[in-house]
């Protein structure tokens, strides 16, 4: 039996999908601005 694929970890979650990580690249900034435009309550993890 294989283990479940999602093993929650808050530090990894922030490092991989967090705001500061998004702002580092041009594509990441585009993601954040698209979510702002759409009116998302939560921009990043």
From Swiss-Prot:
GO cellular component: ribonucleoprotein complex; ribosome
GO MF assignments: structural constituent of ribosome
Cystines in this chain: none
Entry keyword set: Ribonucleoprotein, Ribosomal protein
Keyword set includes rRNA processing: no
Ribosomal protein among keywords: yes
GO annotation terms (biological process): translation
PROSITE patterns the UniProt entry points to: RIBOSOMAL_L34 (PS00784)
InterPro entries noted in UniProt: Ribosomal_bL34, Ribosomal_bL34_CS
Pfam families per the UniProt record, alphabetical: Ribosomal_L34 (PF00468)
Family to which the UniProt record says this protein belongs: Belongs to the bacterial ribosomal protein bL34 family.
PANTHER family: LARGE RIBOSOMAL SUBUNIT PROTEIN BL34M, MITOCHONDRIAL RIBOSOMAL PROTEIN 34 FAMILY MEMBER
Protein's recorded name: Large ribosomal subunit protein bL34
Species per Swiss-Prot/TrEMBL record: Corynebacterium urealyticum (strain ATCC 43042 / DSM 7109)
Taxonomic lineage of the native organism: Bacteria, Bacillati, Actinomycetota, Actinomycetes, Mycobacteriales
């Amino acid at each position: 039996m294989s283990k479940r694929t999602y093993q929650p970890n808050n530090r990894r979650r922030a490092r991989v999908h967090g705001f500061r990580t998004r702002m580092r690249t041009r594509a990441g900034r585009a993601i954040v601005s698209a979510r702002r435009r759409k009116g998302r309550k939560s921009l990043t993890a």
